């Protein structure tokens, strides 16, 4: 039974495509603007764009809650909220901390943007095209995470850690403790997500090898 294809202009494919465009723009800024202005000027010129693009992921929580997608709600909330904490809780509320003004901000944007460009384009192709995503996109989706996931998480943790003292002095001890609790949540959260991707990769690579073998016969 063939899968039901969606129109490119229907909500879910369009959301994925626009999200890919948004992250592509951020990657373009890293490549084109950062070498010209450096840090911390680059952070101040791009933090609002990064916040806006990342906040678009709130729609993923809504989609999961309504059953529009099959992603588990708790997993989606955990993934999105950790990033929202960074863009809203640090970029917007604590913009003068050392983490976001350093090269760590660049490594964060590179890890986030490349990951999301590939992910959203993968979803778009899977929804719209009969043959699904191009093989190169599948390979990128299930191999880049080896480098990009640890890089992104390490960058997030560094940015949060550098904001701890400012969180207490500018807001309250409670806010500092919230940030610490968020950091501790990465201990079970990251291995769980990473191992899930490893398991998914194993299935996908096996399927690709099987498909490639059939074409040779």
UniProtKB/Swiss-Prot annotation:
Q: Where in the cell is it found?
A: Endoplasmic reticulum membrane; Vacuole membrane
Q: Which UniProt keywords apply?
A: Endoplasmic reticulum, Fatty acid biosynthesis, Fatty acid metabolism, Lipid biosynthesis, Lipid metabolism, Lyase, Membrane, Transmembrane, Transmembrane helix, Vacuole
Positions in the Lumenal compartment: 30-47, 95-99, 161-178
Result for mutant: residue 83 to A: Greatly inhibits the fatty acid elongation cycle. Displays normal KM but reduced Vmax values
Q: How does it sit in the membrane?
A: Multi-pass membrane protein
Reactions it catalyzes: a very-long-chain (3R)-3-hydroxyacyl-CoA = a very-long-chain (2E)-enoyl-CoA + H2O; (3R)-hydroxyeicosanoyl-CoA = (2E)-eicosenoyl-CoA + H2O; (3R)-hydroxydocosanoyl-CoA = (2E)-docosenoyl-CoA + H2O; (3R)-hydroxyoctadecanoyl-CoA = (2E)-octadecenoyl-CoA + H2O
Active site per UniProt: 149, 156
This entry carries the following GO cellular component terms, namely: endoplasmic reticulum; endoplasmic reticulum membrane; fungal-type vacuole; fungal-type vacuole membrane; nuclear outer membrane-endoplasmic reticulum membrane network
Any stretches that span the bilayer, and where are they? 12-29, 48-66, 77-94, 100-117, 143-160, 179-196
Q: Name one Pfam family in it.
A: PTPLA
Which EC class does it fall in?
A: lyase
* UniProt family annotation: Belongs to the very long-chain fatty acids dehydratase HACD family.
Name listed for the protein in its UniProt record: Very-long-chain (3R)-3-hydroxyacyl-CoA dehydratase PHS1
The encoding gene: PHS1
């Amino acid at each position: 039974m063939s899968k039901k294809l969606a129109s490119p202009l229907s909500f879910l494919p369009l959301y994925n495509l626009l999200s890919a465009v948004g992250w592509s723009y951020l990657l373009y800024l890293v490549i084109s603007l950062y070498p010209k202005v450096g840090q911390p000027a680059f952070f101040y010129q791009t933090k609002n764009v990064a916040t806006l693009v990342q906040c678009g992921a709130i729609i993923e929580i809504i989609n999961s809650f309504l059953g529009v997608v099959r992603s588990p709600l708790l997993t989606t909330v955990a993934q999105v909220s950790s990033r929202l904490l960074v863009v809203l809780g640090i970029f917007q509320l604590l913009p003068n901390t050392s983490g976001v003004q350093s090269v760590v901000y660049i490594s964060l944007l590179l890890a986030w943007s490349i990951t999301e460009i590939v992910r959203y384009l993968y979803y778009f192709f899977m929804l719209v095209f009969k043959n699904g995503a191009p093989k190169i996109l599948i390979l990128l989706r299930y191999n880049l995470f080896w480098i990009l996931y640890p890089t992104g998480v390490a960058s997030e943790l560094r940015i949060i850690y550098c904001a701890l003292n400012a969180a207490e002095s500018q807001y309250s001890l409670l806010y500092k403790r919230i940030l610490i609790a968020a950091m501790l949540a990465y201990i079970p959260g990251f291995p769980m997500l990473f191992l899930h991707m490893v398991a998914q990769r194993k299935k996908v690579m096996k399927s690709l090898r099987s498909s490639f073998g059939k074409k040779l016969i």
